Structure formats: structure tokens, C-alpha cells
């Protein structure tokens, strides 16, 4: 029986490499979203801390400069939060896009693998059929040989 050789092996490797690249880009996008979520949580915590400090200072005696300084810190944190939220939204859109790209590349790769499997099955079926036919021919020839020898 001849061994099976997949003639599209180079295509299979190419599809696999493209799938792996798409997967690593998708994983990078997930990490970026997680990093930005952490950054956003930290910024909100800082904003809350400044806000709490400002409220404490307003209850007791305070100087106008202190409150003004705290207000500017609060404004800066608000701006930072807005910036991070925008970056997070963009990163999530990129993540969704890269996920779709990965799923597409994965589907293409799996289609080539399925084709290889079908061709392998067809090859083995064909080789098995050839062997069966050869065995039948040998059995038929032996039968005829024995028959001829008996008649002679």
C-alpha cells in the first residue's frame, strides 16, 4: 500500500501560520483591554480618594488653596478617566475585530485539515480496493490453475 501524501501541505502550513498570528494578535488585544480596565479602575479609585479628601476638608476648617488644589486634582482625574474610557472603547472594538479575523483564519485552517482528512480516507479506501482486487485475482488464478491441473 502506498503511503498517503497530502499535496496541499504547504497551504496547510500557511493557513496554520496565519491562524497562529491572528490568535496571538487576538490574545494581545485581550491583554490590552484587561490592562486598560485595570488602569480605569485605578483612576476611578484615585478620583474617589480625592473626592473623599475634598469632602473631609470642606467639613472642617480649610484654606481656599487646598480646596482649589484638590479640585484641580479631581478635574485631572476626570480627564484621565475620560481618556482611558475612550482608549478602552477603541481597544474593545479592536478586540472584536481581531476575534472575527481569528475565527475566519481558524475556519480556513480547519477546512484545509478537513480536506486532508477526506483525501486520506479516499486514498486508503482506493488502496484497500486495489488490494482486494489483487487478492481476488490471485485467488481466481489459483482456482483456475488447480482446475487445469486436475483436468490434465
Regions found by a protein language model. Name each.
Residues 1-152:
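Charge-rich amphipathic alpha-helical interaction elements
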Amino acid at each position: 500500500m502506498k503511503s498517503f501524501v497530502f499535496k496541499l501541505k504547504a497551504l496547510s502550513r500557511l493557513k496554520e501560520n496565519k491562524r497562529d498570528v491572528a490568535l496571538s494578535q487576538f490574545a494581545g488585544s485581550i491583554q490590552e483591554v484587561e490592562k486598560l480596565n485595570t488602569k480605569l479602575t485605578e483612576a476611578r479609585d484615585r478620583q474617589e480618594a480625592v473626592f473623599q479628601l475634598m469632602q473631609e476638608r470642606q467639613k472642617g476648617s480649610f484654606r481656599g488653596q487646598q480646596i482649589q488644589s484638590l479640585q484641580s486634582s479631581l478635574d485631572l482625574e476626570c480627564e484621565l478617566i475620560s481618556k482611558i474610557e475612550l482608549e478602552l472603547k477603541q481597544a474593545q472594538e479592536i478586540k472584536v475585530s481581531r476575534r472575527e479575523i481569528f475565527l475566519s483564519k481558524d475556519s480556513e485552517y480547519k477546512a484545509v485539515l478537513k480536506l486532508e482528512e477526506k483525501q486520506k480516507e479516499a486514498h486508503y479506501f482506493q488502496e484497500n480496493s486495489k488490494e482486494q482486487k489483487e487478492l481476488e485475482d490471485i485467488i481466481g488464478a489459483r482456482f483456475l490453475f488447480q482446475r487445469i491441473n486436475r483436468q490434465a
